[in-house]
């Protein structure tokens, strides 16, 4: 089955929520997001917030990033970040633990754009091809990103030119990663 990015992300999120509910009887929970407002919050308790994804309500895309850097981002990057509001979601890919970065609220969307601008400015300064991060991994110096030139999903080290291709495109990557309830 072929998915576009929005469909693949929605499908992964469904699988992620189902796994949480099967294992705990509750929606996904996060202690990191406790106390931070979001329309995703279903309930709070014991220092955690229980959440479910919501449709992204802002009709803009990552236009602030594009304007700030005079760059055109891959449609897949826009679609990834404006499909839904959700908590970050742990997953695995070929034995590698990762956490998909998600937008939690409208305020978080502003912060995300600022962080993407900083990331892209650093890459430009170091003369690296532009990428947009989509997931963190256990190593603080490495991340999973989408190459803005090719649309490939890559593993990259911050500030380094070496990159490992993980998937031909973001929709395919989201379709094969496996949800996890913890890292």
Where are these regions (language model features)?
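A surface-exposed partner-binding patch
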Residues: 1-140
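A recognition module on extended beta-rich or small alphabeta surfaces enriched in W/G with H and D/E
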Residues: 135, 141-143, 155-183
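Short acidic-glycine loop/turn motifs at beta-strand connectors
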Residues: 147-150
